[in-house]
Amino acid sequence: MLEAYRQHVEERAALGVPPKPLDDAQTAELVALLKNPPAGEEAFLVDLLENRVPAGVDQAAYVKAAFLAALAKGEATSPLVTKERAVYLLGTMLGGYNVAPLVELLDNAELAELAAEALKKTLLVFDAFHDVADKAKAGNAAAKAVLQSWAEAEWFTSRADVPEEIKITVFKVTGETNTDDLSPAQDAWSRPDIPLHANAMLKNERDGIYPEKPGEVGPLSQIKELIAKGNQVAYVGDVVGTGSSRKSATNSVL
C-alpha cells in the first residue's frame, strides 16, 4: 500500500497537483499498518492518518473515525497514537462520523475534558446537539461546557482578528469571466478532482493571460510568479458574473 501510494504521489507531482486523499480501502490498510507499524515508516503513517484522509461523511472518514474511537475507548491500540491523540484527531474531522464517538466520550472520566474541547470546535453536529443537551441536563459537566462554548461562539471568537489591512497582488483578468473560463465544460470529467481540474482554469488565451498549454492548461506559471511576491493573490476581472454556477466554480477552483 505504501509503495503504491508513493508512486501515486510522484505521478500527481508530475501533473503539478497534490495526491488524492486516501479512499476507504487504503484507509483500512493504513489502520492495519498503524496497529503494527513497519520500522522506519512511523512518521509517514501518522502523517497519512492526520492529513490524507478526508473529513466529514466520506467512507474513508468512517474508517478513520471508527479507528480513532476504538483507540480512545481502549478497544484497539497503536504504538503511534495515544488515546488522547485519538480524541484530538477526532476533533479535527469537522463533523459527520466523528461526532457520535466524541459525544459518547463525554461520559468517559479520563477523556471527557478532551472530548469537550474537540466538540467546542465542531459545528456540524446536527441531531447530536440534542444528545449533548440531554447529557448536560443530566448533570454532565463536560456536556455543559460544550453547550456554553457553543452559546458563546468560542469556535469563532477564539480565532485571530481580521487584519486591519491586507496587502494583495492583483491577478488581472481582462474581459468577462464566465463559468466555462473557470471550470471548462470540456474538462468536466476532472471536476471531482479539484486540484487537477483547476489546471484548466483560463486555459484559453486572452489579453494578458498566458496559458501553459493553450486549450489544455491555464496560466499556472503566471500565477506562481504572483504568489512569489509574498502577498495574497486576488482575482480581479473586468466582469465577473454572480450566477450560481460561477459561484460554485469560484469556490472550488479559485
Model regions: which residues?
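Structural detector for internal amphipathic alpha-helices that build alpha-solenoid repeat scaffolds
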Residues: 15-20, 42-59, 80-95, 101-104, ...
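Short coil turns that connect the paired helices of HEAT/ARM alpha-solenoid repeats
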Residues: 35-40, 73-81, 105-112, 135-139
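Active-site-adjacent structural elements in folded domains
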Residues: 71, 83, 218-221
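Amphipathic alpha-helical scaffolding segments comprising HEAT/armadillo-like alpha-solenoid repeats
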Residues: 24-31, 55-74, 93-107, 125-136
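Amphipathic alpha-helical packing elements
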Residues: 2-31, 36
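Short, charge-rich binding segments
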Residues: 77-83, 87, 92, 224-228, ...
